Structure formats: C-alpha cells, structure tokens
A protein has these predicted regions:
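Flexible, low-complexity charged segments
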Residues: 1-124
Length: 124
C-alpha cells in the first residue's frame, strides 16, 4: 500500500522544549495513530509533550501511571477530527482542549501546564 504524507508539521522540537526552564516535559507517550473522520479516513500520527512544573515528580509519576488512558483519549480525540480541522490555525485550541481534558478527566492528583506537538503527520 502506498502511503503518502499529505501534511507534516513539526511544530515544537526537543531543542525548544529543553530551552523552557519553567517546565519539565513528559515525552514518553510515543507516536499515536488515529484515523480521521474523513471519508475515506486518513491516518494521523501525533506525538505530544506534556509540560508540568519543574521538579514535580508526583505529576510525572501520575502521567506514567495514566499513560494508557492518555493515549486512548488522544486516539479518540483525533479520530473525531477531519483533515480540514487539523491545521496550524487550530493547534492552540487543540493544545488547550487536550490539556483541559487530561487535567479534568484523567489526572486526579496533579495537573499538566502545557501541551506541545512534537509531530503531526497526516497520510493518505
């Protein structure tokens, strides 16, 4: 099967994450694959970093413990989006929605403060 990359957005890289002294970054979720709601569906691959207060080991531990729930949420979240929605202009909105959902519905003893995209690819 021929897979063509339709869109590739590397909107935030490891170098930039390391430059922000206010946060530690959880980058171990890995690449999450989902199918868009387009007909026919496209494949989206995303990798995100979750920022939390520097030195907050409780948040890091809780993210580790809840990583399966976070990945499942992200897969479902992007499965409800179309290619036309997954654009740079909507990225700030996505990051805010993702942060709020994780804080309100997945994490119970801690909070993340930032969400950044490390990778966002859409394929045929």
């Amino acid at each position: 099967m021929n897979r063509n990359v339709v869109q590739s957005e590397n909107t935030f890289n490891e170098y930039n994450l390391n430059q922000d002294d206010n946060y530690d970054w959880y980058t171990s979720l890995g690449v999450i694959r989902a199918r868009t709601c387009d007909e026919p569906p496209l494949i989206i691959k995303i990798d995100i970093a979750l920022g939390y207060e520097k030195g907050d080991e409780q948040t890091k531990t809780e993210i580790d413990l809840r990583s399966i729930e976070i990945k499942d949420f992200l897969r479902k979240y992007f499965s409800k989006k179309s290619k036309s929605e997954i654009t740079d202009k909507n990225e700030d909105f996505f990051m805010l929605e993702i942060k709020n959902f994780i804080n309100d519905n997945i994490l119970s003893n801690s909070k993340i403060t930032e969400v950044k995209f490390l990778q966002k690819d859409i394929e045929n």
